[in-house]
């Protein structure tokens, strides 16, 4: 009877040891699986009609030997990134590849780096991230104004780069319907009002009560296809 109990106890302890070993291995596999091969892409500011290089930089390698992402605008495939180590060693964080954007033929707006494939040294698939970025045209803004007694009148002009203007060579054109905020510097920049640009790119004048001479500047708000911009300051 005593020997039977000892055998049963040994079997029970052995069973626990086996279960414990499996649990540890599962945790390690889970840790590896939780790593996501990741890319980052900087926003693109379009100010010419030339082809733009859009670098995609690896931020988490996770032991991958290859990884690729599609550059999508909505469902439309524009370009892609492909990173490969050569097959013998894993990729390193900081490695990058180039995608391309053609301003005169491709849409502006929100873009996505969409996962395509990533493999480890055993050629098993690894999870990947998606990354959102924007490609928009640059804006320019200038401010002008004058003083009349205790009032200052300021207005702004906004232009934007149009890659399709000038027979596809691109040029700066008036930017209509843009919201512009005006600021006065009195112990820091304080917003004093807003106007919207017309067809000629100009806003109407904004009247500001200001007995003392102060500095003014203007900021044009971003749109889905235009970047924001702030003017230099003027004193009136």
Spans of model-derived segments:
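Bacterial N-terminal signal peptides that target proteins for export
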Residues: 1-11
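Low-complexity, Ser/Thr/Pro-rich intrinsically disordered linker/stalk segments at domain junctions
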Residues: 2-4, 19-80, 85-236
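Bacterial N-terminal signal peptides
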Residues: 10-20
